[in-house]
């Protein structure tokens, strides 16, 4: 079993050294996906920002957080601005 693992490692290392795997030269690390955002009460959320689409049903602290982080501020009777 160790022999098989060793041979697979050597074969993959040889391909990398010959440039068969990464033909573009320097390769950047793959970016991490954004963290999972839990939906807040009050409706669907916007893309990756964690703030509901409407101002209805969110707490004061959630509204203040969306306003300070993203500039999406709730106004009484008007909904979001910004």
From Swiss-Prot:
GO terms for cellular component: cytoplasm. This is Penaeidin-3a. InterPro entries: Penaeidin. Residues 1-19 form the signal peptide. The modification Serine amide is found at residue 81. Belongs to the penaeidin family. The lineage of its organism: Eukaryota, Metazoa, Ecdysozoa, Arthropoda, Crustacea. The modification Pyrrolidone carboxylic acid is found at residue 20.
């Amino acid at each position: 079993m160790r022999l098989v693992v060793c041979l697979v490692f050597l074969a993959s290392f040889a391909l990398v050294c010959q440039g068969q795997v990464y033909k573009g030269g320097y390769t950047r690390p793959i970016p991490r996906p954004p963290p999972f955002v839990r939906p807040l009460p009050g409706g669907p959320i916007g893309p990756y920002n964690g703030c509901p689409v409407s101002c209805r049903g969110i707490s004061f602290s959630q509204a203040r957080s969306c306003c300070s982080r993203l500039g999406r501020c709730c106004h009484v009777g008007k909904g979001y601005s910004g």
